Structure formats: structure tokens, C-alpha cells
Amino acid sequence: MAAITASMVAELRAKTDAPMMECKKALTEADGDLGKAEELLRVKLGNKASKAASRVTAEGIVVSYIDGTTGALVELNCETDFVSKNDDFLGFGAKVAELVAKQNPADVAVLSALEMDGSTVDAVRSALIGKIGENMTIRRFVRYTNGGKLVSYLHGTRIGVMVEFDGDEAAAKDVAMHVAAMKPVSLSADQVPAELIAKERSIAEQKAAESGKPAEIVAKMVEGSVQKYLKEVSLLNQSFVKNDKQTVEQMLKGVNTTVKGFTLYVVGEGIEKKQDDFAAEVAAQVAAAQKA
């Protein structure tokens, strides 16, 4: 059997970006043949990626990219908070955000087929899954290219905001931070989704009905609750986080600035995380051991 040297392992790692121990195992299995070892790793890492693909990805990062009046905000998911801090994963996210801004893909499927590093986005993603051992997905993205000015704000890597505006950049950055903190669902009250209003109205009706007041009073109570809700969740009507004596709209008017739109991404929002039942897991392991 051929001797496996450190330089051989380093060369294979440079070619495949696989972990050192995986490179050494592949070289041993290939009896020192670098070409065969590389092929073995490609197959092995591909299988590893396939196995990981079914696992829930509720952690991750939000990445932004701005070039003039074109920008992109992207959410990428992984399985653990640890991997969300991995330099390779962060680097992949930065490249994806730049591609979205520059190539304008219609959706994640189109984005996945775009060229990246001499391959495709999806191939690079799969290779990264194989290297790190966790499932990773590109969940969603938004692209701005309407000619307005853009600013972004990232709270760590878990919350990302992009704001399109005309006027004062410092004020727009304050708005981006406000959005991250207060999480409005729309720019103005008339843009709040109908399903959210209907849900809030239903809750208000149930509460008002319990008051025992006359129907006309109940109706006014319900309408008052709905209007209060609309002010609380629409950006322009919210109290400005840095000065609650004025609304966001009033602050913007004071500096002659207009917000044309915004996007807020929170990592894992709406994704159902798997809850580990350790007692059940131990019981299953004991049962399996008894059968063996």
C-alpha cells in the first residue's frame, strides 16, 4: 500500500475542499491515487449532501448587497446556529446576494441554476453541504431596482432590512433600524394585508361581545381596536423608536425624506423547528439495542 503523505492530503483538500480526515480516508482507499481519491470524495460528499437535504433548516443568515440603486436582501438557512457563523457559509451568502442584485433571477430555482465559481449556485451549495455536513437552503430573496436610493441594516446576521427612499440617508438608516426593532408589516395602514385585518377584527369582536354592552357600542369598540392595530403595525404610523413623541411619518417629513418601500427578513420566521424529545430518543435507542 502506498504511503499517504501530508502533502498528498493537502493537495486533495485543495482540490475538493473536503475535511482533512475525509481526504486521508479517500487516499487510503484509493491506495494513494489522487485522481481516484478525488472521484471517491465527489461521490461521498454528494451522498452526504443528499442525506442532509431532508433535514429542517431553521437557523441561518440574512445578507444584503447594494450597488447604487440596485440591491438585494437574501435569507439563507442552515440547521444550527454554529454553522450560521461559518466563514464558508457566510461567503456563499455574500456571493448569492450579489448574484441576485446583478442577474435578477425570477425565483430560487432560476437563481440556483446561475453560474458561480465555474459551476452553478446549486452545485456550490451541494458541495458546501458535503463539506460542512449540514443541510443548507436559499429560502427567499428580494431585489430592488426602481431607481430609488437604498440602505440596509443587519442586526447581527439574523435580522435584515432594506429600505428604498428619497431624501436623507441618515434618516433612512434610522428607519431601517426602526423596522428591525418594531417589525411593521406594511408601509402604510392601507397596505396591511386583508387577512391580518380580518383576524384582528375577529379577535376584537370576541372581546367586545364579552363586555355585554349594546350592539352599537360593541361595533364602535371593534372599529376602535382595528384602527389601533393598523396604526401599530404600519411603519409610517408607528411611534418612532428613537423619539416616541413623533411618528415615523412626522420624523421623515421633518427632514424632507420619503420611504418608498421596505423589506424585513427574520431568520427562520414561519419555519417549524423540530423539537427533540430526548426521552423518546433514549427509549428508542434502548429498544434497538435490546433487539440487536
Curated annotation (Swiss-Prot):
InterPro entries: EF-Ts_dimer_sf, Transl_elong_EFTs/EF1B, Transl_elong_EFTs/EF1B_dimer, Transl_elong_Ts_CS, UBA-like_sf. GO terms for molecular function: translation elongation factor activity. Residues 80-83 are annotated as: Involved in Mg(2+) ion dislocation from EF-Tu. Keywords: Cytoplasm, Elongation factor, Protein biosynthesis. One of its GO terms (cellular component) is cytoplasm. It is found in: Cytoplasm. SUPFAM superfamilies: Elongation factor Ts (EF-Ts), dimerisation domain (SSF54713), UBA-like (SSF46934). It comes from the Bacteria. Associates with the EF-Tu.GDP complex and induces the exchange of GDP to GTP. It remains bound to the aminoacyl-tRNA.EF-Tu.GTP complex up to the GTP hydrolysis stage on the ribosome. Belongs to the EF-Ts family. This is Elongation factor Ts. It comes from Cupriavidus metallidurans (strain ATCC 43123 / DSM 2839 / NBRC 102507 / CH34) (Ralstonia metallidurans). The gene is tsf.
